[in-house]
């Protein structure tokens, strides 16, 4: 009986995938591609093996939906520790383990090194997971710079026979930078998913910005994603100073980007707190529901705010003024929505950089009969006296910005504050469908997590999270006033393309007088 040849690591790859000539060809592509070096390999894995992996995952893996400020996705845990599973569990994921070991094999790491010129890669640090993007899932702009990451990769396991069309969404989108650490508003290169396709790029501080386009169809965009790391302690090529150097580089780059950030907030003085005069009430009644202007009404609001640190006022604007605004906003919604920053025209501007926020905005100076949103209201001395009466806080300065969050595009990522603030939002989003939180567009306040290894803005995961302080869906004619303590996270969740309209609002921050 003849000897049976044992399969090798190379047998787990597609024919000729690791040939020297292929590495040379891919290296030329990698170094030519922009906006930063990247390359696509297809096919990479033995087709039968990868089909078995997909079948294993569909049948044996539990996916948990996780929602944060930056993403919505179905995830597995870290798959590096497959070796630690019991024998039954290992057997249920034996093909996945074969692919994991193939990706981190000496043969493939050497192939990646030849393509990228990145130098040695860690054999011991396996860092990967399986993600499924269902309809509505997305990942916002970021650069992947964490720890010792060197190469970021994604291996697609979308349906192998039907194919994945670009109009399904889910593309990996790459962003150029206006300067290091400052990505442009718009992506310049898009890589749609394909079966058995590996896309990878070098993780470079200040440059490797990318996102994942929302998935628009009821088809699972399944992928194995992960990173190759620089050598770890004890491995050839280990550099003990790498992480410190990366942090230093990032801090230096971040300090240089502030001048480009938009909008730029200018704070304006606030009048001294005083009771409302009849003239004040007459002025405000042109805008605000009279129920919120009576002495008794103001006293009730003030008591509620003192107790809860938040009030939410429905039908805030009077009916006549609200109807006028509604017509303006619906007329604007019926016009083609400018999606690329080059299509945005005065008086609107695009908020950047997109790894912090993206939306259209009107700044403090933009007001008048041709401006859709009532930017003049909070500038009125009468309104400033009213908000101080309601909040019970003497205020010294404020800024405001009118915003439009477009479906399929806009969001703010979680920010924290160094001092306590008073925040007011007048939400003017038309239609009842915009209030469906499955489509995002809600404003959220959360307790920040002090553990740097925890994703602070996770608010939907394995268990019901009690870190949410306040969640406000987009709505029509609703005014919210929030006392935001130091360290509280706040963001507006990405607006899905499924939303029936934009989120429109006027957001303002008010600085209390120091005690």
Curated annotation (Swiss-Prot):
Positions of 2-oxoglutarate binding: 156, 221
Sequence positions that bind Fe cation: 142, 144, 210
Family the entry assigns: Belongs to the TPA1 family.
Gene this chain is encoded by: ofd1
Transmembrane segments: none
The protein's assembly and partners: Monomer and homodimer. Interacts with nro1.
Keyword Kinase (UniProt): no
Any Gene Ontology CC annotation: nucleus
Catalyses which reaction(s): [ribosomal protein uS12]-L-proline + 2-oxoglutarate + O2 = [ribosomal protein uS12]-(3S)-3-hydroxy-L-proline + succinate + CO2; [ribosomal protein uS12]-(3S)-3-hydroxy-L-proline + 2-oxoglutarate + O2 = [ribosomal protein uS12]-(3S)-3,4-dihydroxy-L-proline + succinate + CO2
Localization per record: Cytoplasm; Nucleus
Tagged with keyword Oxidoreductase: yes
Superkingdom, natural source: Eukaryota
A GO biological process held by the record: regulation of translational termination
Protein name, as recorded: Prolyl 3,4-dihydroxylase ofd1
InterPro entries tied to this protein: Oxoglu/Fe-dep_dioxygenase_dom (IPR005123), Oxoglutarate/Fe-dep_Oase_C (IPR019601), Pro_4_hyd_alph (IPR006620), TPA1/Ofd1_C (IPR043044), TPA1/OFD1_N (IPR039558), uS12_prolyl_hydroxylase (IPR051842)
Principal subcellular localisation of the protein: cytoplasm
Annotated function: Prolyl 3,4-dihydroxylase that catalyzes 3,4-dihydroxylation of 'Pro-62' of small ribosomal subunit uS12 (rps23 and rps2302), thereby regulating protein translation termination efficiency. Negative regulator of the stability of the N-terminal transcription factor domain (Sre1N) of sre1 which is released from the membrane and enters the nucleus to activate hypoxic gene expression.
Gene Ontology MF, one: peptidyl-proline dioxygenase activity
Enzyme Commission designation: 1.14.11.-
Signal peptide: none
Cofactor annotation comment: Binds 1 Fe(2+) ion per subunit.
Source organism of the structure: Schizosaccharomyces pombe (strain 972 / ATCC 24843) (Fission yeast)
Fe2OG dioxygenase domain segment(s): 119-230
Keywords carried by this UniProt record: Cytoplasm, Dioxygenase, Iron, Metal-binding, Nucleus, Oxidoreductase, Transcription, Transcription regulation, Vitamin C
Cofactor field: Fe(2+); L-ascorbate
């Amino acid at each position: 009986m003849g000897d049976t040849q044992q399969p090798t690591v190379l047998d787990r790859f597609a024919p000729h995938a690791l040939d020297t000539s292929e590495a040379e060809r891919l290296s030329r592509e990698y170094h030519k591609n922009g906006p930063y070096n990247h390359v696509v390999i297809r096919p990479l894995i033995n087709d039968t093996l990868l089909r078995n992996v997909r079948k294993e995952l569909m049948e044996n893996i539990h996916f948990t939906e996780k929602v944060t400020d930056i993403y919505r996705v179905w995830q597995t845990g870290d798959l590096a520790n497959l070796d630690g599973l019991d024998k039954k569990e290992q057997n249920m994921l034996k093909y996945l383990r074969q692919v994991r070991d193939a990706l981190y094999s000496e043969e493939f790491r050497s192939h990646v090194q030849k393509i990228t010129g990145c130098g040695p890669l860690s054999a011991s640090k396996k860092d990967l997971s399986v993600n499924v993007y269902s309809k509505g899932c997305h990942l916002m702009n970021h650069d992947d710079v964490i720890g010792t990451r060197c190469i970021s990769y994604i291996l697609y396991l979308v349906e192998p026979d039907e194919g994945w069309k670009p109009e399904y969404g889910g593309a990996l989108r790459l962003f150029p930078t206006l300067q290091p650490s400052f990505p442009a508003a718009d992506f310049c290169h898009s890589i749609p998913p394909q079966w058995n396709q590996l896309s990878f790029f070098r993780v470079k501080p200040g440059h490797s910005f990318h996102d994942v386009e929302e998935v628009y169809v009821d088809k699972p965009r399944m992928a194995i994603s992960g990173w190759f790391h620089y050598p770890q302690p004890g491995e050839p090529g280990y550099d003990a100073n790498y992480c410190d150097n990366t942090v230093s580089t990032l801090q230096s780059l971040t300090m240089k980007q502030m001048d480009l950030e938009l909008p730029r907030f200018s704070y304006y003085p606030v009048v001294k707190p005083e009771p409302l005069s009849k003239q004040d009430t007459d002025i405000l009644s042109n805008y605000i529901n009279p129920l919120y202007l009576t002495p008794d009404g103001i006293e009730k609001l003030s008591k509620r705010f003192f107790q809860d640190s938040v009030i939410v006022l429905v039908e805030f604007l009077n009916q006549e003024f609200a109807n006028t605004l509604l017509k303006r906003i619906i007329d604007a919604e019926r016009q083609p929505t400018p999606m690329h920053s080059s299509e945005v025209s005065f008086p609107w501007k695009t908020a950047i950089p997109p790894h912090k926020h993206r939306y259209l905005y009107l700044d403090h100076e933009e007001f008048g009969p041709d401006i859709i949103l009532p930017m003049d209201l909070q500038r009125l001395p009468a309104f400033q006296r009213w908000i101080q009466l309601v909040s019970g806080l003497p205020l010294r300065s404020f800024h405001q910005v009118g915003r439009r969050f477009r479906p399929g595009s806009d969001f703010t990522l979680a920010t924290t504050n160094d001092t306590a603030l008073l925040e007011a939002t007048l939400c003017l989003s038309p239609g009842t469908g915009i209030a469906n939180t499955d489509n995002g567009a809600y404003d959220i306040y959360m307790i920040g997590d002090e553990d740097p290894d925890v994703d602070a803005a996770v608010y939907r995961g394995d268990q019901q999270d009690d870190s949410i302080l306040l969640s406000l869906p987009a709505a029509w004619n609703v005014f919210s006033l929030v006392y935001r303590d130091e360290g509280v996270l706040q963001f507006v969740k990405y607006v899905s393309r499924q939303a029936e309209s934009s989120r429109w609002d006027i957001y303002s921050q008010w600085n209390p007088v120091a005690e």
